[in-house]
């Protein structure tokens, strides 16, 4: 099985959209874990995170269990998050002698790994403690790359964090690849950015997925339905692209 973090230093790059739709598109049993206090993945799966009593935060601090926190849907199982997760740093400061601050998520999930074929972690747009926990718990990382000017500089920041986490805490951590997102077919800039990204990351021995996710207004509207976009707009071209990306992931060695 694989534990895959969807990680980016920058918001608005399709990170949560990618996490939610991959969780639905992948074959087998999938768990989506939200580690972003904004709660957008939870909203996309039909819940109001602000009304959730049990979340990833309560699991991490031992106030709830996996079984009474996980929410089971027809698309995937998921563990929600809300703004309470922003308080985790303070909890750790107050309990630094009792809790390992970088292995909390791994320690919480480890006994449930065998229940799933894939665990997808939606990271916050930062390289702080929440993202480090996600990387320590992961086998692989997928990095969304928005096809716009200077996008690669933000990707390099998260790559640095991944390599540092690999060095210090998780020696088997691997970058599965970079997925180009929000590709605007109406402009030449997206094509130029993608071409340069493929050349640049090839030199770093980092895979760029063959699948490119196009910019799609409908996908931005999908969270209002409480369903993954691929389960709302069944025949849309972008839906086919997410299934193609899922196939690439399933064939990854």
Task: Locate the predicted segments by residue.
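P-loop NTP-binding core
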Residues: 1-253
